[in-house]
């Protein structure tokens, strides 16, 4: 059994014993998880039935493939020719600039946990006091996910699509309720 992004979506637990296997998406005794009306947190897990002779590395490989599956790829030229977005497609790429954009996306703050994975606290708004002493959640309001979508279209780099999917799933499960 492997739970998709279990660490990012904690608390999670998997238990195996002589009576069977249990996947605990919200384990007992973890404290309160408060969900508002309309929230519907999607959780995915894979059960892989295999022979006892299967090697551990093969089982691990199945889990890794499940955690990071193949994704479809559309070449940046196809996006550009389609004309469905602003022209973010340079004639010549500058490696230093591209690396800095990737580093900015990779360094974007992230919050973890079942209700927070895919979101982040907006430190600027929080410091300004807009939350009345409480953190102000960005709820991925447009900028970061939109930038990731454009970056995926213009480069085809998978990490941008992965970041976008995590944000979109958070929107669907938590923010749009």
Residue ranges and their predicted role:
Residues 1-177:
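Catalytic cores of extracellular degradative/oxidative enzymes
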